[in-house]
Amino acid sequence: MTAMGKSRRMRRSVAAGACVVAVAAVLTGPAQAAADSGGAAAGNGGASTYTKGLGWKLKPSGAEVRFRGLAAVSRSTAWVAGSKGTVLRTTDSGASWANVSPPGAGELEFRDIEAFDRKRAVVLAIGEGEASRVLRTEDGGKTWTEAFRNDEPRAFYDCITFFDSKNGLAMSDPVDGKYRILSTSDGGRSWRVLPSEGMPPAQTGEAGFAASGQCLVSHGRSDVWLATGGGATARVLHSKDRGLTWTAAETPIPAGDPARGVFALAFRSRTQGIAVGGDYRADHASPKASAVSRDGGRTWETSASPVPAYRSGVTWVPHTKSVALAVGPTGTDVTVDGGRTWKAFDTGSFDTVDCAEDFGCWASGEKGRIARLEP
């Protein structure tokens, strides 16, 4: 979900400083009406509040579909992907959105998108058999090329990630008892299924959740993590060699049901990670729905003060050591201590969240909702 584009060092420093001050204000300042900031509230029915510093500002998309795929390129540029084969792109900070959906894709369900810049993006459609596809564009969505169409009836692809502009992976629910991994080394132009010998067996009923495009995430040149649910325990699988071999670790996030498990991961380094999830059913509680790892995903512990409900998306705020955002149907939470404790600061519904290197943080979800984090 994260864009590959980079910004200049000075811009990073300024953005990081503003971020730290603003997020601290979010946690310590009194709530105030969104109208005070002169923008539209991102919460439900206008009931959401902005606190001192930052808040979500809705960026009307003109669409009614659900956007579970999101790639933040910068504060000005973002891509979203969703149901009914819909892909939108903004290059003016969300003031307008161009419909750049692939022709003839109306029956596809896009759940993940990776953008390298304002021109190049790779989008994943999910579903059984041929419904799982990968498409790519190099001209801002004017034209699209189908790069992969699944021909295994039992495969169901959930998420996609890139290490850089050339190398990436996609993951499918288990086939013959093991997760299936696709690999590309040419920016998504071609894909191959990796050997399964290095993949540990899946648990009975275990699968990934195509809820936010964050069930498969990477950091650096070769580390990648895979989130699971539906089995007896919610696990995180880790590969240090771009998907050739994997190790599995149990998390304390509740599982044991097809609706429960780890829905999203975020790693700010090879060692420091956050997992969020829970039970996506609105009438079921989600205690212990967030966990942290300090050893690259080998071990996980429940947050001392977890997110208050099911969360489907999570992202680190760039250029900080301990600030992250988590989103779900009932709101947004922020942590300033690396995931140990979380505090809610918005009640609007979002499925996924992503931050660019220049501190352009975006969120998207149901009914065409897209927002950017702003003062």
Model regions and ranges:
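Secretory targeting and sorting signals
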Residues: 2-35
